From Swiss-Prot:
CDD domains: KOW_RPL26. Keywords: Ribonucleoprotein, Ribosomal protein, RNA-binding, rRNA-binding. It holds the Pfam family ribosomal_L24. Belongs to the universal ribosomal protein uL24 family. SUPFAM superfamilies: Translation proteins SH3-like domain. GO terms for biological process: translation. This is Large ribosomal subunit protein uL24. One of two assembly initiator proteins, it binds directly to the 5'-end of the 23S rRNA, where it nucleates assembly of the 50S subunit. One of the proteins that surrounds the polypeptide exit tunnel on the outside of the subunit. One of its GO terms (cellular component) is ribonucleoprotein complex. Part of the 50S ribosomal subunit. It comes from Myxococcus xanthus (strain DK1622). The gene is rplX. InterPro entries: Rib_uL2_dom2 (IPR014722), Ribosomal_uL24 (IPR003256), Ribosomal_uL24_KOW (IPR041988), Translation_prot_SH3-like_sf (IPR008991).
């Protein structure tokens, strides 16, 4: 079981995108995870500009902003209950032994 999934709300903790004055502004939803490169793409963060050529698939060329990638080690999952960035733990629950993710700060289930 993975500790970070697509659709999770995360906060950037370190790197160029981290904000020391107001860390809550650097939050977003995970769009894509590249496990081999250990990078994550987050909605609205680390926007990079790409110069696109006009093609039949994209008739409008020009400069387009796309989300870039952030190192997986620089982000943490935000708990929905305590609204803080947290480490994620995994435990088995119920008779079937299903694995569930939980917040290590407040012990609430993440999914």
């Amino acid at each position: 079981m993975q500790k970070l999934k697509v659709g999770d709300t995360i906060q950037v903790m370190a790197g160029a995108e981290a904000s020391e004055k107001n860390p809550a502004t650097k939050r977003g939803k995970v769009l894509k995870i590249d496990r081999e490169a250990e990078r994550v793409t987050v909605e609205g963060l680390r926007l990079v500009k790409r110069h696109m050529k006009k093609t039949p698939q994209s008739p409008e060329g020009g400069i387009v902003e796309k989300p870039g990638t952030i190192a997986l080690a620089n982000v943490q999952v935000v708990c929905a209950k305590c609204d803080k960035p947290t480490r994620v733990g995994i435990r088995t629950e119920g008779e079937e032994g299903k694995k569930k993710r939980f917040c290590k700060n407040c012990d609430a289930l993440i999914d």
